[in-house]
């Protein structure tokens, strides 16, 4: 089963488009985990176990682990998800963008060391920076397209010679040329529903969209679903991180995360 098949299976069997982002910040951990050498792993594992019934994928952000010299804990976390929830894909949020042997090693890091099912990448250096990931035919490659941050407009909205904005050129390039083996997806922020709709129209049902910006960043659930869903009323990994994993800083942090995930899943399903 390749990444897209695994993701589609998770959407259907979990009845969920929710992706839980894992962005561990030890300063925000509950008191019971403070000072523990395995605090990052323990926190993320607790969040995963609490939210797995309501999620269709998980997205660990590699920088939150690397900054605390906790790559080994990320490796253990990915192993925990694969072992306990083998039906739920892991999307490693790395946003890599180099070329040649460097990119090949980044791909090995994502797919061999962490055994992620997909990874996020930057298209700025062109196909050369994406091909090393595409060589792993059963894995997903999620390409930055129209990101949720305000500064994304500095480049992504610039007009091409034919008048279309750069982000739509990227969407077309990925859909028409880079997705020969059905491996690719796009990152498109919920904070720009008009652009999200334009991307979905451009790529049709061919690509899954990873949609950050719901929750702490203020994206609207109804607008997001109406703009980004495919013809099967799926096709999206709607990501929420902080609003779920930091729903409570007290002893009820697991239960609060579960309720936040349940509530967001249900809110998404209500407008599908």
From Swiss-Prot:
Gene Ontology molecular functions: orotidine-5'-phosphate decarboxylase activity
Biological processes, Gene Ontology terms: 'de novo' pyrimidine nucleobase biosynthetic process; 'de novo' UMP biosynthetic process
The keyword Lyase is annotated on this UniProt entry: yes
Catalytic residues of the enzyme: 95 (proton donor)
Cell membrane is among the record's keywords: no
UniProt pathway: Pyrimidine metabolism; UMP biosynthesis via de novo pathway; UMP from orotate: step 2/2
One Pfam family from the record: OMPdecase
Xref: Gene3D superfamilies: Aldolase class I (3.20.20.70)
InterPro entries associated with the record: Aldolase_TIM (IPR013785), OMPdecase_AS (IPR018089), OMPdecase_type-2 (IPR011995), OMPdeCOase_dom (IPR001754), RibuloseP-bd_barrel (IPR011060)
Superkingdom, natural source: Bacteria
Catalytic activity field: orotidine 5'-phosphate + H(+) = UMP + CO2
Documented EC number(s): 4.1.1.23
Key words, A-Z: Decarboxylase, Lyase, Pyrimidine biosynthesis
Family: Belongs to the OMP decarboxylase family. Type 2 subfamily.
Protein name per Swiss-Prot or TrEMBL: Orotidine 5'-phosphate decarboxylase
The organism of origin for this protein: Bordetella avium (strain 197N)
Record gene name: pyrF
